[in-house]
Amino acid sequence: MRIVALEGIDGSGVSTHSRLLHARLAGAGVKSCLWKEPTEGPVGRLIRGFLRSTEGVDSDLMALLFAADRLWGLRLGVVERCGGSPEVLVVDRYKYSSLAYQGVGSGLEWVDAVNRKAPEAEILVYIDVPTEVALRRITARERREVFETPEFLERVKSMYEEVLRLARARGVKVIRVEGVRGGVERGIEDVQGEIAERVFEALGLARA
């Protein structure tokens, strides 16, 4: 199973582009499955409750919960939902989100350690969007989550740079895609076209 993880700060379009990439892969005849974190499993439901809370969230606790939810997904959830092991698993956020988000409060080294059982992705697509653009998109939503504050997202964005360096050092193919170019937001089709082309190439598949 080849894991393709899509990452970025909240408001960068990770969920949208994960769904579109999966559709392109499936349309090309690839046995692809779309997976989202937090999952719909028992631990994932607990995490979602914390994320919607207006109270503070303990970073260490969240790191452990996300790690447990991730292993549940990899060992049980994916097989059940995907009807076996897919050729390509497109993940709407993976352990790199934990390293960035919980790494801010708990330290990258410790969060990395509790996620060692989760294999590295083959490809990590990082959608790079300025914090102010992400916040504008988040503000347009009906509901916001506990992590979606300007100060915190800025720290997460900086932490992602460390996470990307770590992933590269471990042999992960990192694909950085700009969501804004020349000060102008790129359209969804434009961004997805670049993501699909570069992912297909990295996987050794015919052009999307």
From Swiss-Prot:
Residues 8-15 are annotated as: Defective ATP-binding. The keyword Nucleotide-binding applies. One of its GO terms (cellular component) is cytoplasm. It comes from the Archaea. GO terms for molecular function: ATP binding; dTMP kinase activity. Its EC number is 2.7.4.9. GO terms for biological process: dTDP biosynthetic process; dTTP biosynthetic process; dUDP biosynthetic process. Keywords: ATP-binding, Kinase, Nucleotide biosynthesis, Nucleotide-binding, Transferase. It holds the Pfam family Thymidylate_kin. CDD domains: TMPK. It catalyses: dTMP + ATP = dTDP + ADP. InterPro entries: P-loop_NTPase (IPR027417), Thymidylate_kin-like_dom (IPR039430), Thymidylate_kin_CS (IPR018095), Thymidylate_kinase (IPR018094). The keyword Kinase applies. PANTHER family: THYMIDYLATE KINASE, UMP-CMP KINASE 2, MITOCHONDRIAL. Belongs to the thymidylate kinase family. HAMAP family: Thymidylate_kinase. This is Putative thymidylate kinase. It comes from Aeropyrum pernix (strain ATCC 700893 / DSM 11879 / JCM 9820 / NBRC 100138 / K1). The lineage of its organism: Archaea, Thermoproteota, Thermoprotei, Desulfurococcales, Desulfurococcaceae.
